[in-house]
Amino acid sequence: MADRLSLHSHLTNEGGPLAKSISGNDEQSPIEGRAASSRSAQTSATHKEARAPRSDDHAIVSTDRHVLANDRIKGLARRTFNKHVLSEIGGFSGLFALDAERFPDPVLVASTDGVGSKLELAIQLGLHSSIGSDLVNHCVNDVAVQGATPLFFLDYFAAGHIDPDIVQQVISGLVDACKANACALLGGETAETPWLYGNTDYELAGFLTGVVSRPRLITGEAIREGDCLLGLPSNGLHTTGYSLALKLLLNTAGYRPEQYVNELGDKVGAALMRPHRSYLSPIRKLIQAEVVTGFSHITGGGLTENLPRILPRGLAAHVDLSAWDPPPLFTHLKKLGSLDHDEMFRTFNMGIGLVAVVPADLVKKARLTLTRMNERSIVLGRVIRKATPRIVYS
């Protein structure tokens, strides 16, 4: 991605009016009243050492900040609890009771991820809550495409300097997304590691567990030649392609995040910071309608690398490029970087965030199911018999 010096040259008002001018909001969403869940009271070794009596004032301040951050987290996190959460805040681990009646013959489905280079931009703009939603939604989609229901989420937050206000904003985003996807924020870790991160830097990772009854597990093995590829739109880059996008927009073009660009139809920062969509609702509706043989969440690697992941041996995806027009963000990135087709479709989602594989005779029913929930769909192509390459564009 663009190096920090390049980003800093464009981002000079961290977290304040600049963030407001990019988002178009005069004030940030209130954190009071947001949902939450259980979080471990454990700290990294750094904080355990800081709790011992010392004359080092910095160590004492570090401990105070860490305690304040964790207190705020607890108030948020507890609100995502449901009847299946058995642990209270402060334990060594989170406890969750599986509903065996609802999920007979259960299979646990797990996913872990980060948000990549998008985090760098979020830090510089002070838009910390949206990055939490990005992370949860990404993980939710990864388990949902297997037919799983999200159960609980855990996060790992590490920073060079624990700022309770920033931690609260990040966790509030996690909590909002957990509530929206009906999963519990079961726990997490907050670590201060100044020898690894700069004073304003942090890293965020998440871990999500879901469950599905074995007979309802979706693996793609039921996909057959002639099945239709039904695409659901993304709302932007989601969480992939940011290294290249930041380089092209901020360095090559020299745009400022608060700058409105006609080719984008939006401010640069707003176009880049749109949250990663959760596709849980349309996935559930399609599963309930019994019209799908597989799903592909289009993340890093784009359509080119993600569609083949679900196809049985000997089958390939044929994608009709005339079926949809990629949103302006992607066409402008292509122009700025003089990028060829292959690089675009391997780097970006090109406006498609999820692909549902549907038998040809069920396409009408599938699209009607989506239309009824105001979800747009695009017939992208079909599954063909071909050993290699695993995806063909025409």
Locations of regions flagged by a protein language model:
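Glycine-/charge-enriched secondary-structure boundary and capping motifs
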Residues: 2-10, 19-23, 32, 39, ...
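Glycine-rich phosphate/pyrophosphate-binding loop regions near the starts of catalytic domains
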Residues: 75-235
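Short, acidic (Asp/Glu-rich) active-site segment that either coordinates a divalent metal cofactor
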Residues: 112, 203, 216-264, 268, ...
